[in-house]
Design a protein with these regions (language model features):
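N-terminal, positively charged nucleic-acid-binding surface of large information/translation enzymes
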Residues: 1-108
């Protein structure tokens, strides 16, 4: 049976679009490692997502005059598009405000 690996990356806030700093600083190193592990036949689960909680989201939503959920949706979609455009190999790019995130946070 293949060795199992859980690989994660820092979750950026949804207070703006992703940029090269996100790619170089956190996504690229973990993506390279995930690809390396897969190439070696390891069972990899590579996860990340958008952090939709906290002050940055609240301040950003207020600055744009949007309800927080609309603001989160707007920037999550932009983040997801950037992840795809960068061709990152995440198995899951999630969201912290989903019900599963709340349930799992309580379990942890």
């Amino acid at each position: 049976m293949a060795q199992k690996y859980l690989i994660t990356s820092a979750l950026p806030y949804v207070n703006g679009e992703l940029h090269l700093g996100h790619l170089i600083g956190c996504y690229l190193p973990s993506d390279v490692y995930a690809r390396f592990c897969r190439a070696r036949g390891r069972d990899v689960l590579f996860v990340c997502g958008a952090d939709e909680h906290g002050t940055p989201a609240v301040v950003g939503a207020a600055a744009e005059g949007l309800p927080i959920i609309e603001y989160n949706n707007k920037y999550y979609e932009k983040h997801l598009r950037a992840v795809r455009d960068f061709n990152l190999s995440f198995d899951l790019y999630g969201r912290t405000h989903r019900k599963t995130g709340k349930v799992n946070s309580r379990i942890i």
